[in-house]
UniProtKB/Swiss-Prot annotation:
Membrane topology per record: Multi-pass membrane protein
Name listed for the protein in its UniProt record: Phosphatidylcholine synthase
Main location: membrane
Cofactor(s) demanded: Mn(2+)
Record keyword Kinase present: no
Keyword Magnesium included in the entry's annotation: no
Single annotated GO MF: phosphatidylcholine synthase activity
Regions crossing the membrane: 14-34, 43-63, 77-97, 104-124, 134-154, 156-175, 191-211, 218-238
One Pfam family recorded for the sequence: CDP-OH_P_transf
Organism listed in the record: Legionella pneumophila subsp. pneumophila (strain Philadelphia 1 / ATCC 33152 / DSM 7513)
UniProt keyword annotations, A-Z: Cell inner membrane, Cell membrane, Lipid biosynthesis, Lipid metabolism, Manganese, Membrane, Phospholipid biosynthesis, Phospholipid metabolism, Transferase, Transmembrane, Transmembrane helix
Length: 255
């Protein structure tokens, strides 16, 4: 009688577990970033926060590459990702806002951070927070990136208050925000997908350089970093509303 072979090789199991541990490592780094914020070492904390963003940016692609759902079906990678992301994208930047002087007016620190945590909890628990066609529905809780820009550009407390309040509201507005690592439904063009990935990489490099050069700011890196943000928002609103306008025009033409 031939022994029953496992459905996957040892290397496949190792690769799948590695990806899950890689994702979970971002939670560990997130705790260290909280510690650095507590020590008022804000630049170091931002570096650690940047590492968690990098991990989040690539772990999904790695998971699909090694087929983690098939190899480890009893491990919920999406749940793990949400747990880690809520720490790094919500709790850590809220702690930054609470600890760092000058980020928010004293009377607004607690209400704003409370609003962020509650609205973000709503965002994370929606069934369609990530839509079937791979977009984020509503503002995708980029609070860590928001705090990064506020710190780098030393924006005023009033500006910070207005922006953070606006983003809390945008969580409830069903705009489809681009999922940078899942571009299949954004465009069918292979060239445009490659171009988008290149732009994302360039954004990472420019943001890296902004942090390296802090407190000095270089116009090139500022332009590239904010230019990507502008492009991201344009594509998100275009992808949300253009199909609606197109369908309405088509319906009117038929009438």
């Amino acid at each position: 009688m031939n022994p029953i072979k496992p459905p996957f090789t040892l290397n496949q199991y190792f690769a799948a577990w590695f990806v899950h541990v890689f994702t979970a490592s971002a939670a560990c780094i997130g705790v260290f970033s909280l510690y650095k914020i507590y020590q008022h070492d804000y630049v170091f904390a931002l570096w650690l926060m940047a590492i968690t963003v990098f991990i989040d940016a690539v772990d999904g692609s790695l998971a699909r590459l090694v087929h983690v759902k098939s190899v480890l079906p009893k491990i919920d990678g999406a749940l793990l990702d949400n747990i880690v992301d809520y720490l790094n994208y919500v709790i850590t930047p809220c702690f930054f806002l609470l600890v760092k002087p000058g980020m928010l007016p004293a009377d607004y620190v607690v209400p704003i951070t409370a609003a962020i945590t509650i609205t973000s909890a709503y965002q994370f628990c929606q069934d369609d927070a990530k839509t079937p066609d791979h977009f984020f529905k509503g503002f995708p809780c980029y609070w860590n990136i928001t705090v990064f820009y506020m710190y780098i550009f030393n924006t005023s407390m009033i500006v910070n208050t207005v922006l953070l309040s606006l983003f809390c509201v945008l969580i409830f507005i069903p705009v489809k925000y681009v999922y940078p690592s899942r571009l299949d439904y954004l465009t069918e063009s292979r060239v445009l997908k490659i171009l988008m990935h290149c732009c994302s990489a360039l954004y990472g490099i420019s943001s890296f350089c902004l942090l390296v050069n802090y407190p000095e700011t270089n116009k090139l890196w500022v332009s590239l970093s904010l230019g990507y943000v502008g492009m991201y928002l344009f594509l998100s609103f275009y992808r949300t509303y253009y199909p609606m306008f197109k369908a309405k025009i088509t319906a009117n033409n038929k009438d």
